[in-house]
A protein has these predicted regions:
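Generic structural signal for beta-strand residues in well-ordered domains
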Residues: 40-41, 55, 100, 157
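Charged, alpha-helix-enriched surfaces in structured cytosolic catalytic cores
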Residues: 4, 8, 57, 186-190
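Residues in well-ordered beta-strands of folded domains
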Residues: 14, 63, 165
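Gly/Thr-rich phosphate-binding beta-strand-loop-beta motif of the actin/hexokinase/Hsp70
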Residues: 41-66
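Short, flexible loop/turn elements at secondary-structure junctions
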Residues: 17, 52-54, 111-113
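Mg2+-dependent endonuclease catalytic cores in nucleic-acid-processing enzymes, primarily RNase H-like
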Residues: 68-201
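Short coil/turn motifs at helix boundaries and re-entrant loops, enriched in small/polar
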Residues: 6-7, 54, 115-118
């Protein structure tokens, strides 16, 4: 009933510390193993998640994931207007567009509250962001996008593939997959279940 991999065996027989608590959703051992993995990523897709807190005790967070596999930098900002958070997002988009010109960028904004203002602002600015990134790329290639004589050459410079996505994290739950014994009540629980499954695998 309690094999060598169980915490009962570890504590009572081997005299070791348990690897998880009975009520843990995600075992610490899985997290520790996951931090040791080296994930090579082509950086063809960049997701930027934005959770807006505005003036509360919480922080607004911008979080980057490459190819749905590897985390990038985390930016945290306190006591900012939604327009300021939009500005931080635009800077981040431009920074990653310059560093990874072949990547598509998907900005996912939590719109279950204050984030809807950031979403609206970014969605409204989308064409201007794409244009500004394209002009920067032209200049990087030694071209002047404002010079009519270089217009034809500038057309060979690729535009940024940018997506602004409205997300709602309080939605319906379900199972991570058909074999999952756990039915999650909402999308937040489902998200944690997916993380748990990835770490377990």
């Amino acid at each position: 009933m309690f094999g060598e991999d169980s915490d009962v065996f570890r504590v009572r027989v081997a005299g070791e510390f348990p690897k998880s608590t009975p009520d843990s959703l995600i075992a610490m051992e899985w997290c520790e193993k996951a931090t040791q993995l080296e994930i090579k990523t082509a950086k063809l897709r960049i997701d930027i998640g934005i959770d807006v807190a505005r003036y509360g005790d919480d922080s607004s967070v911008l979080y980057v994931v490459f190819d749905k596999q590897k985390s990038g930098e985390i930016e945290m900002h306190n006591h900012n207007k939604t327009t300021e958070i939009s500005g931080y997002a635009v800077k981040m988009i431009k920074r990653y567009a310059a560093a990874y010109p072949e990547a598509s960028i998907h900005v996912k904004v939590d719109c279950d509250g204050l984030g809807v203002g950031v979403y609206d602002n970014l969605d409204e600015q989308k064409e201007r962001i794409v244009q500004a990134v394209w002009e920067d790329r032209c200049r990087e290639a030694g071209l002047d996008p404002k010079d009519g004589n270089q217009w034809r050459d500038c057309q060979d410079v690729p535009e940024l593939d940018l997506h602004i996505v409205e997300c709602h994290f309080g939605g319906a739950g379900g199972k991570v997959d058909d074999d999952d014994p756990i039915e999650y009540v909402n999308s937040t629980g489902l998200m944690w279940g997916a993380v748990r499954q990835k770490l377990k695998d």
